[in-house]
């Protein structure tokens, strides 16, 4: 059993506080230490503008992200056309106004330290 004290708290994504699911993906949230951390898991073929936009109600993701890629690869394209492929170990900042999609045939997993509470939410 994991400790649950006021000065020490350990949580795991195997038991998240919240799970947001959508076609080809899921976003798990852990609330700890006054912040919300998210774990994104997307299947090959996932694309934000196709699979999350209907939930968010916008054509591009308007959430600001800071995170790290754990496995797989994803491309990110900004509204002005700039794009980048994110790979395992990349620590990223992505501003509002972007699309993203899985690159290749491996699932993509990343941790999000900024923006998690607003992601895949109306």
PLM features: residue spans?
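Short, acidic/polar N-cap/turn motifs at the starts of alpha helices
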Residues: 17-19, 26-27, 37, 64, ...
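Short acidic-glycine-tyrosine-enriched beta hairpin
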Residues: 78-97
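A short, N-terminal "cap"/entry segment at the start of jelly-roll beta-barrel domains
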Residues: 1-41, 49
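Short beta-strand segments in beta-sandwich/barrel cores
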Residues: 47-48, 72-77, 100
